[in-house]
């Protein structure tokens, strides 16, 4: 676990991989608090207590850093979706599968509401070196839910083909509006959240 004392180590005290993790963690915290536009490589060096040269050994440029923070943001979303699944019903029934589908959709929207600055960066495409795959992957969590719905007969084979794009677009679009504060007050947003999730079920003819 990374703590503030961890982030104050000198260059020599960090193992190669540890420093990269610390830098991404610091970048993630910064974006969550201050937004994307103020993120910088030299600033991260100051926060983590290492030299700018050490930072540049891990990130060729700002685009590379932003890509890494974007990946970490997607992983925060993935963890929120998995946490929602842990709290959802576990029964291997149609109702259970639908409840789990709704729970991950709700978590996606909550990510936009509660972590709007991370939402802003999570799905931006940056010109950077290839990174390891996102894990946990929000897309894979959605796909697993849709496969379960299909196997239980809640989602037809025909609708399964377009279900990922439709479900993702509906929830992602609403989460984006919520992140910008465009869905009204807390009560109105909660009501609209329920509506969009129910609309996703209807659009995919899940029953």
Q: Language-model features: where?
A:
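Generic hydrophobic, amphipathic alpha-helix propensity
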Residues: 19-28, 44, 69-73, 77, ...
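N-terminal intrinsically disordered/low-complexity leader segments
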Residues: 1-18, 88
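Amphipathic alpha-helical segments used for helix-helix packing
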Residues: 109-129, 176-184
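Alpha-helical DNA-contacting segments of helix-turn-helix folds
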Residues: 31, 66-73, 80, 122, ...
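Hydrophobic alpha-helical connector segments
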Residues: 82-115, 167
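Amphipathic C-terminal alpha-helical segment
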Residues: 148, 168-186, 202-207
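Helix-turn-helix
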Residues: 22, 26, 30-64, 68
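Amphipathic alpha-helical packing segments from all-alpha helical-bundle domains
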Residues: 95, 99, 110-111, 127-154, ...
């Amino acid at each position: 676990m990374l703590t503030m004392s961890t982030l104050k180590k000198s260059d020599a005290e960090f193992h190669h991989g540890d420093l990269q993790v610390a830098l991404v963690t610091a970048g993630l915290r910064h974006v969550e608090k201050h937004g994307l536009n103020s993120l910088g490589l030299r600033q991260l060096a100051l926060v983590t207590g290492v030299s700018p040269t050490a930072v540049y050994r891990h990130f060729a440029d700002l685009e590379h850093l932003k890509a890494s923070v974007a990946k970490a943001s997607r992983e925060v979303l993935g963890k929120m979706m998995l946490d929602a699944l842990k709290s959802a019903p576990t029964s291997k029934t149609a109702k259970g599968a639908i409840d789990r589908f709704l729970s991950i959709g709700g978590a996606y929207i909550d990510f936009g509401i509660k972590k709007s600055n991370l939402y802003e960066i999570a799905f931006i495409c940056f010109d950077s070196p290839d990174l390891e795959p996102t894990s946990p992957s929000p897309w894979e969590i959605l796909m697993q839910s849709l496969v379960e719905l299909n196997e239980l007969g809640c989602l037809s084979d025909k609708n399964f083909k377009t279900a990922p794009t439709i479900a993702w677009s509906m929830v992602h679009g609403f989460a984006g509006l919520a992140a910008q504060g465009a869905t009204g007050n807390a009560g109105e947003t909660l009501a609209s959240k329920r509506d969009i999730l129910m609309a996703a079920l209807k659009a995919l003819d899940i029953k």
